Every structure is written in C-alpha cells, then in structure tokens.
C-alpha cells in the first residue's frame, strides 16, 4: 500500500471478511508519554500511516473482503491551510472536520467527501472547495 493517505487522520475503519474487524482511530493519550503526544499531528486521532499496515494485513488475502469502510479526516493544520489558501472567513474551530469516506461494497469502491461545521451556515463554499481539493489530490497522486 502506498503512503498517499498517510497524513490523513483515521476516524474509523471497518472490514468485514471471514470475521469483522473494527478499528477506532481515537488515540488513548495515557498510552503515550508527553514527548510523543507533542510530536503528534493530532492528540485525538491516529494517522492513517500509523495503522495502514494493520488494515492492509486484514484486507489482503486470496479473497476480497465482503465490504469495508474507512473514514479519514484532515488535520487542523491542513484545514487551516485550506482556509488561508482560499481566503475563507472561517477558523478551524468553525469546522468540525473535512472527511473522506471510502466504502467498498464487495464490487465497487465509493468515495464521498463531507464538510461538517460547528457553526450554522447555508454557504457551501467550503464543501465545494473540499471536493475540488480531493479531486486535485486524486489527480496529483494518479488515483483516478
């Protein structure tokens, strides 16, 4: 598996094959020392890169999984970068998350994006920018 998504944060991963596997991406802060916590991108969720090999080991094999779902979100630093680059009148605290949902139903993969806000807004600018960023990311990494 390529490290393309390694900087994304993992909210959850679910794989259903011979048995069902669920990985909660929430970090257990008591497991880490202070220095390790300070070095992390997020103190809430692990990065995809930190668990990618575990999930790959669950998915690989002679048979495809029956289905799987992976929910990734951007770090606050990357959300802030999008805000600044697009001159949005928002702060990172206004945005709950920018997510990328990957779902395999046994035959095809569906990718959906979502911009979740902590404030009420009818403005869909952020959602449209997030969609465009994901499309550009896929193109840059030759995914589609």
Regions found by a protein language model. Give the residues of each.
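Mixed-charge, glycine-accented linear interaction segment located at domain edges/termini
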Residues: 109-144
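Short, surface-exposed, charged/polar-biased interaction segments
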Residues: 22, 26, 91, 119, ...
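Surface-exposed, low-hydrophobicity interaction/linker segments
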Residues: 39-107
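Generic "edge-of-domain/loop-turn" microfeature
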Residues: 10, 15, 28, 77-79, ...
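Charge-rich, low-complexity N-terminal segments
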Residues: 1-48
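Phenylalanine-focused residue identity feature
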Residues: 5-8, 31-32, 56, 68, ...
């Amino acid at each position: 598996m390529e490290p393309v998504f390694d900087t994304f944060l993992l909210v959850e991963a679910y794989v259903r094959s011979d048995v069902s596997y669920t990985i909660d991406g929430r970090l257990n802060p008591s497991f880490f020392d202070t220095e390790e916590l300070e070095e992390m991108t997020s103190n809430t969720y692990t990065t995809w890169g930190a668990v990618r090999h575990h999930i790959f080991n669950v998915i690989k094999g002679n048979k495809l999984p029956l289905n799987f779902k992976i929910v990734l979100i951007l770090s606050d630093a990357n959300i802030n970068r999008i805000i600044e680059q697009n001159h949005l009148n928002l702060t990172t605290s206004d945005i709950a998350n920018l997510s990328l949902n990957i779902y395999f139903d046994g035959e095809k993969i569906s990718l959906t994006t979502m911009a979740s806000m902590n404030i009420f807004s009818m403005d869909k600018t952020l959602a449209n920018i997030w969609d465009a960023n994901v499309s550009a990311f896929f193109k840059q990494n030759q995914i589609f």
